[in-house]
């Protein structure tokens, strides 16, 4: 039996409102699936899922605003949830679709929940990984969880997070992938270098 040929991953850009988003896409099925990455990641986080899902669907994995090759608006106000949701709506328009299945992880899952709550008509299916429904997260919040979520507040500070992350050749980024992975060794040295390269992409 011959192995199935690997599907091609194609790169492109979509102008959505005031920003330009880089994305990769795979497959050509009728149903659109949008994959939203977490923090501090980019489309590469979905590299294993893209060719598998692409056998049945048209799969799109954007670099969300502020990440890798997408535009990086300078103000904190440029990253409010309304604008992040609008970016996903812009992707739907770019691909000429009125609905999509959304698969999202971490920070991207927060955006996906907001999209589904505010625009349920555009979400055919939703798979949110690692982030519960916002109301459930709020109602079950504990001090221990709040302490573990320190980074969400830290990375909203001006300038300090950039200095912290870039010190010693982005050693902190290295640690984030090596020490927080559920499965030790899940990220190869090559993977981590690719993630570091994405972090240093200019604005």
Each model region followed by its residue ranges:
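Flexible "cap/lid" subdomain of the alpha/beta-hydrolase fold that forms the substrate-access gate
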Residues: 1-12, 18-21, 26, 32, ...
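Alpha-helical segments within the soluble intracellular
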Residues: 53-54, 93
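The serine-hydrolase catalytic nucleophile loop
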Residues: 39-50
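Structural cue for short, hydrophobic secondary-structure segments
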Residues: 35-38, 61
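Active-site machinery of serine-nucleophile hydrolases
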Residues: 54-63
């Amino acid at each position: 039996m011959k192995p199935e040929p690997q599907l091609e991953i194609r790169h492109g850009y979509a102008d959505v409102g005031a920003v330009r988003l880089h994305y990769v896409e795979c497959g050509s099925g009728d149903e659109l699936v949008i994959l939203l990455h977490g923090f501090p990641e980019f489309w590469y986080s979905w590299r294993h899922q893209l060719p598998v899902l692409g056998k049945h669907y048209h799969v799109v994995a954007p670099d969300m605003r502020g990440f890798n090759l997408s535009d990086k608006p300078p103000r904190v106000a440029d990253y409010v949830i309304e604008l992040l949701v609008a970016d996903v709506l812009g992707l739907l328009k770019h691909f000429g679709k009125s609905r999509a299945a959304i698969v999202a992880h971490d920070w991207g899952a927060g955006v996906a929940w907001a999209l589904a709550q505010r625009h349920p008509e555009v979400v055919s299916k939703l798979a949110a990984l690692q982030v519960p429904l916002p109301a459930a997260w709020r109602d079950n919040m504990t001090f221990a969880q709040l302490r573990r979520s320190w980074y969400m507040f830290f990375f909203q500070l001006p300038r300090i997070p950039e200095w912290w992350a870039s010190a010693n050749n982005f050693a902190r980024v290295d640690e984030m992938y090596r020490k927080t992975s559920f499965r030790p060794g899940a990220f190869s040295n090559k993977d981590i270098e690719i993630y570091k390269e994405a972090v240093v992409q200019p604005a």
